[in-house]
């Protein structure tokens, strides 16, 4: 009897552990202000101009034991750009930059994930911005996961990439120090 009980407990523990190692689906927690899509670009080579996008949503699946099976999808409203300066934001929304009247949404959808070290990954995917779709690689880092105080389960990541403005049809010349923009992404997802 004791052997059967121990065997059942061992099998149950193994199945429970296997279930925890399977991929889980998450929705990015934008509503709780636990996710950000920020950017920075050099201003004349003297300082950094920082900004954010306020309106976006997305989801991801993640399996720590098999990260190459992970997937990411994000949709962003380009008109939600905020650089803390109303006139500059109006210019960024214009045809000189994001052309939000013609291209109101930017999207990123992963095509592959590759482990690059302990808790680090390269997420390859297609970024559609300003009417142009190009492959990009986001260098990402797993921050952590666990239960939250409200009965849910969360996982968090940060990442970043550099984009050449001209690659996405942005022809406005900002000078030699401002040809690229850094995207800085921080997300916390709630498991579904």
UniProtKB/Swiss-Prot annotation:
State the compartments where it is located: Periplasm
Q: Which residues form the signal peptide?
A: 1-23
Top-level division of the source organism's lineage? Bacteria
The Gene Ontology CC terms held by the record are:
periplasmic space
Primary location group: periplasm
Q: Which Gene3D superfamilies match?
A: Lipid/polyisoprenoid-binding, YceI-like
Q: List the disulfide bonds.
A: none
Q: Which SUPFAM superfamilies match?
A: YceI-like
Which Pfam families does this chain map to? YceI
InterPro entries xrefs: Lipid/polyisoprenoid-bd_YceI, TTHA0802/YceI-like_sf, UPF0312/YceI
Q: Which UniProt keywords apply?
A: Periplasm, Signal
Database matches in NCBIfam families:
PRK03757.1
Family recorded in the similarity comment: Belongs to the UPF0312 family. Type 1 subfamily.
Fetch the PANTHER family from UniProt: PROTEIN YCEI (PTHR34406:SF1)
> What is the protein's given name?
UPF0312 protein Avin_03250
Q: What is the lineage of its organism?
A: Bacteria, Pseudomonadati, Pseudomonadota, Gammaproteobacteria, Pseudomonadales
